[in-house]
Swiss-Prot record:
Keyword list, A-Z: Acyltransferase, Cytoplasm, Transferase
GO biological process, one term: protein catabolic process
Organism from which the protein derives: Trichormus variabilis (strain ATCC 29413 / PCC 7937) (Anabaena variabilis)
Broadest EC class assigned to this enzyme: transferase
Protein location: Cytoplasm
Protein known as: Leucyl/phenylalanyl-tRNA--protein transferase
Length: 191
């Protein structure tokens, strides 16, 4: 199937995101409230995770195994990442928009975060882990990276209890779109 990458990026740039429904039909979705991961002092994580970080059990990589991260994110009992959406992520990756931020333990992929980068916006699509704490370490290290690269926002789309532990917060759609417009003017890069 042919996909128009420019149209897909335009959809994300307007504040929408792709998801497949229970019948694997792909569609654009929006939200009245959007969840952001703070890139300032509001970002936090459990003290137990600090011990894991201090042990340096994991190394970090970007795009070392993009396909494995997409597969890991999609490999759930109930998933919104259809086969078609996996193909779109691959095309977005090949054109420089989709990234995998990964943690590794030796030669084993421990966890990762799948995201789309447009200007100074990192749009987190999904995350997974194979080794306990793998995705949590990825979250901390990704926030550090986004800060270093002067990103404007880390969009997590929808709130869940896991994200709340990192200081995630909701903003109204109007405020989100204003922040997104600012992010789109930025020339930040992940790599």
């Amino acid at each position: 199937m042919q996909y128009d990458i420019a149209s897909i990026i335009q959809g994300y740039a307007q504040g929408y995101f792709l998801m497949a429904d229970d019948n694997d039909c792909l569609g654009w979705y929006g939200s009245r409230d959007r969840t952001l991961i703070p890139l300032d002092e509001r970002f936090r994580y459990p003290k137990s995770l600090q011990r894991v970080l201090n042990q340096e059990r994991f190394t970090v990589a970007i795009n070392r195994d993009f396909a494995a991260v997409v597969a890991g994110c999609a490999n759930r009992e109930s998933t919104w990442i259809s086969q078609e959406l996996q193909e779109i992520y691959w095309l977005l990756h090949q054109t420089g928009y989709a990234y995998s931020f990964e943690t590794w333990q030796g030669e084993e992929l421990a966890g990762g975060i799948l995201g789309i980068v447009i200007g100074g916006a990192f749009i987190g699509e999904s995350m997974f882990y194979r080794i306990p704490e793998g995705s949590k370490v990825a979250m901390v290290k990704l926030v550090e990276r986004l800060r270093q690269r002067e990103f404007v926002m880390f969009d997590a789309q929808m709130m869940n209890p896991h994200l709340e532990r990192f200081g995630a917060y909701r903003i109204k759609d109007k405020e989100y779109k204003t922040l997104l417009e600012k992010a789109l003017l930025s020339s930040s890069t992940l790599i």
